[in-house]
Structures are given as structure tokens and as C-alpha cells.
From Swiss-Prot:
Sections of the chain in a coiled coil: none
GO molecular function, one term: metallopeptidase activity
Residue sites binding Zn(2+) per the record: 173, 175, 186
InterPro entries linked to this entry: MPN, RadC_JAB, RuvA_2-like, UPF0758, UPF0758_N
Protein name in UniProt: UPF0758 protein NMC1174
Record organism: Neisseria meningitidis serogroup C / serotype 2a (strain ATCC 700532 / DSM 15464 / FAM18)
Keywords: Hydrolase, Metal-binding, Metalloprotease, Protease, Zinc
Superkingdom of the source species: Bacteria
Family under the similarity heading: Belongs to the UPF0758 family.
Start and end residues of each MPN domain: 102-224
Amino acid sequence: MSIKQWPEGERPREKLLERGAAALSDAELLAILLRVGTRGMSAVDLARYLLQEFGSLGRLMSAEVGKLSAYKGMGTASFTQFAVVREIGRRILAEELQESIVLSDPDTVADYLRFHLGQEKVEVSVALLLNRQNQLIAVRELSRGTVAENTIYIREIVKLALDEYADSLIIAHNHPGGSPEPSQEDIMFTRRLAQAMSLVDVSLLDHFIVTSQSVRSFRQLGLMP
């Protein structure tokens, strides 16, 4: 049965208009983006199938075009739509972060980092550069490595902070393997970086580790020097 044959109150678009987007399931929201299904499957059925295949909405929305194209009804148009949605969401979160006092709004930082780094396939490190009021100046990518290796040079982070006239910074990196727990190397690197930043009167406020499911804060774990 096509969605047009459903009771009006159960159709995703009508349901959104009547009850708001939060009332829709992941599959219903995705169906609105997909617009149409495939032969024998409504857009909602296709959305449910794709969510089951990819395991989560985040993995589906960040899938590469080649992988999406392996599924009937999916291709470059769907990939483009998903990429646009992700980028709009990232920019909205960045705007919220830019307007917030970072230390008083750690959830916004965590949400931004999860959205920005959580679905990366390789390890990526970023720095959030802050002014004296702990407001965001800029977000800069520090490095991008393989799944198991990522090299960050402390002197480059120090130079970046000075070039941006930052008073403090937060660093973050993802663990593509899925475990958010800090390694001994993560802890030692954080200590060395904090010491180096103190020599130029810039504070290292926190170090976050990000996975697709969670975010860990060194400060909350009691691991900041």
C-alpha cells in the first residue's frame, strides 16, 4: 500500500504538520527525505529497511555514495540530500556553539563534536579555539589519519592558538573503533600539550574523545592536568 492510501493522520508529512517533527520516528523522517519508495515498498518501508541495513540513522546519513547506490532506489540524489542535511545540521550546531559560553554549555559542545566527528571512518583531531570569555573563535582540523593512526604535533597546535589569538582551547578526536575510553597515549599527549600551552599563556580546558554513540570529557573523568 502506498503512503497516499494511508489514513491522513498517519502519513509522515501530515503527521509532522499536525504533531511536530519530534513525533515522527526515524523511519518517518527519513521517508519524507526519500519522498518515494521502490516497487513493492513505500517510502517508509524503504526507510525502515535502510535503517536496519545500516544500523543507525547516523551511519546511513554518512554512507558513501557507492555504498548507497548498492540499494535499489538510492543513488547520487539521495547521497546529495543526506550530505546537505548533515552539513546544515553541523552549521546550526556551530552557530549555537559560537553564540554560547562554552564552559556553561558542555552539552552543546558534546553534541557538536558527536555530529562533527562521530561518523568519521578515520581518526580526526580538531581544536576549538576560545576567547577570554570562553566563546568560540574558530574550529580547526588538526589532523586526519588512518583508522589506527593519527599524528598531532604539539608545536603546530601552539602556533595555531597564537595565530588565532586564542586565550584557551579544547581539543577533540574520534575513536573510529567505537571505544570512547582514553588510551595511555591520549593521557600522556594531553599532559604534554597542557604543559606546552601554559608556556605561551594559553589554557587547555578539556580534551574530548568522540564515538558515534558517546563523548568522553577528560575534565569530567578527572584526567586534565
